[in-house]
Every structure is written in structure tokens, then in C-alpha cells.
A protein has these predicted regions:
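Extended catalytic cores of very large enzyme megasubunits
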Residues: 3-294
Length: 295
């Protein structure tokens, strides 16, 4: 890395700013950051604890956000140089300096140009599998992908509407499906097991209101100690909300998008909506997602 930096500097010294690589004590980094943030102790501590580049032994290699912004600017300039009319590291630094014009997300601030850790360059990921997803193989594949992303600092979200409802026939010794709630617990436990610099990962689970197990999903976190490693949200549709307003029944089915579903049942939409509101008041979950507003 140092040889590459030297080569880039010698061949084009105006385009790259080489930050000296040395490590700092926590007090040194905190002191410099405190000056940078003009006495804001919280900002200084958060930056040193979460965003200053460190190796796996805890050695700190940046003393203030100025070093971080040069690291990001140099790395982006390296990529820019491959394209016409590239921006120099000085120009990029001017956009980043003191968080004036560009404020990267947390993971990019930590990961871009970081040669000490394998870190994600995105804060959040939505994952799933292509094709048939209702099998143990598919469920565990999602679990593995979730863990791999989380250990690289990524937050993860995935939908459980592909899992067959409780009581559905299965071709194994269990004879019937356990439904989606036990898998909520599995994904939650995986989240709790993955450390991210002393904190657990971030997981969001969702399910369609059209899924026959959506009420069990909505109730899952009402029991203390259950699904503590995940936030949960239910995906609502306009036809469900209209049924709830008019006091009409609403049809749930599995698969949720099938024209000829294997299973259907009618529910009281108004009662389920009231349960969503009550549970959110009681435990702050579930959240609600309106599919027509997703982007």
C-alpha cells in the first residue's frame, strides 16, 4: 500500500495527498477530534469510537476527521483517475472537509480506503434468494448471507413472506411446517451472535399482511425476550387498509402472489389493524410498510 501511494505521489503529486501512516493513542485522537469539533465532546468520542480507522488490535490510525476525509478523497481520486475529467483528491477533500457538502454514510466513512479491515461500503442490504425460497436450504442460505454481511458491518433486511404458514404439509418427518415465527428467532439469534465493534448487528424482518402467519408475526415480540435481535415491520396493502376501514373481511393466502394459492383464509381486517396499533403502542413494534410507497 505504501509503495502504491509513493508511486501515485511521484507520478502525479498534485492529485494525491499522502497522509502519514502512524498510530495514535485514544487520548491523542480524542484531543485532536475535540479541537476539530470545536469542543463537542459527544461528536469527538463518537468519531473516535466508530469511524476512526483501527486495526484488529485496536490501534488507531487517524487522529481526526481531517485524516478520514483525506483517506476517502485519496481513494475516490484513485478511481476517478480511470475516467475522463477526474476530480483530484484536493477537490474531493474540499467537498468532504468539515462535512460541508458531502456526508457519507457510516460504513463508507469507515470502509473507503481502509486497508486494516474488511468493511462494507454500504450501510444496509436487502437480501433474499432467486426462485423457490421455501426450503431449509434457502432459509439457511439467507441466514449465512446475513451473517457474512453483518460481520462486515452491514445492516440487513429481508422478507419472510416466502415461508409457508404454520400447519402446511412438508415432506419430512415433521409432516407439517412450524410457520415463520421460529425462523424469526433464528435470524434474530444470528444477529445477536455477530459482534460489530462491541455492538450487535442491525436486522429488520418483514412479512406481507397477506401471509396467513402475519398475525403470529405481529404478536411475536409481545413475549418478553423473544426476537430481541431484530426489528419487525408488516407490509400493508391498500386493499387491506380499505377492508379495515369498511369493516370487511380480508383474504390471506399462500403463496401470497399466487393466482391459485395452496391455502386461503378470511380474517377480520379491522381487528388485525387494531392489533397492529395496540402492539406498536405497547412494545413499539411492529412497524408498518406501505408497499405502494416503497423505493
Amino acid at each position: 500500500v505504501q509503495l502504491l501511494q509513493l508511486y501515485l505521489f511521484v507520478t502525479n503529486p498534485k492529485r494525491y495527498n499522502i497522509v502519514e501512516k502512524k498510530n495514535y493513542s485514544y487520548d491523542e485522537a480524542y484531543g485532536e477530534s475535540l479541537k476539530y469539533f470545536q469542543g463537542d465532546e459527544l461528536a469527538a468520542r463518537v468519531w473516535v469510537n466508530k469511524y476512526a480507522v483501527k486495526d484488529s488490535f485496536g490501534n488507531i490510525y487517524e487522529k481526526s476527521p481531517e485524516d478520514m476525509h483525506w483517506r476517502i478523497a485519496n481513494e475516490v481520486a484513485r478511481i476517478e483517475a480511470k475516467y475522463p475529467n477526474p476530480l483530484s483528491s484536493e477537490e474531493l477533500f474540499g467537498l468532504l472537509d468539515h462535512f460541508k457538502y458531502i456526508v457519507p454514510q457510516g460504513s463508507p466513512m469507515t470502509g473507503i480506503g481502509n486497508n486494516y479491515q474488511v468493511a462494507s461500503l454500504s450501510n444496509c442490504f436487502v437480501i433474499g434468494v432467486d426462485g423457490e425460497a421455501d426450503s431449509y436450504g434457502a432459509i439457511f442460505k439467507i441466514d449465512e448471507e446475513q451473517v457474512q454481511l453483518m460481520k462486515r458491518r452491514g445492516g440487513v433486511g429481508h422478507d419472510l413472506s416466502h415461508i409457508r404458514p404454520k400447519g402446511s404439509p412438508v415432506k419430512n418427518s415433521a409432516l407439517t411446517s412450524t410457520g415463520l415465527v421460529p425462523f424469526m428467532e433464528r435470524y434474530s439469534n444470528s444477529t445477536r451472535e455477530v459482534a460489530q465493534d462491541g455492538r450487535r448487528g442491525a436486522l429488520m424482518l418483514s412479512v406481507s399482511i397477506k401471509h396467513p402467519d402475519s398475525e403470529a408475526f405481529i404478536d411475536a415480540k409481545m413475549t418478553e425476550g423473544k426476537v430481541t435481535g431484530a426489528n419487525v415491520s408488516v407490509k400493508l396493502t391498500d386493499d387491506f387498509m380499505q377492508a379495515a376501514i369498511e369493516g370487511k373481511p380480508y383474504t390471506q393466502q399462500y403463496p401470497i402472489d399466487a393466482t391459485e394459492p395452496a391455502f386461503q383464509k378470511d380474517i377480520d381486517a379491522s381487528a388485525l389493524w387494531k392489533k397492529i396499533v395496540h402492539n406498536a403502542w405497547k412494545s413499539a413494534e411492529p412497524g408498518v410498510l406501505f408497499r405502494s410507497e416503497e423505493h
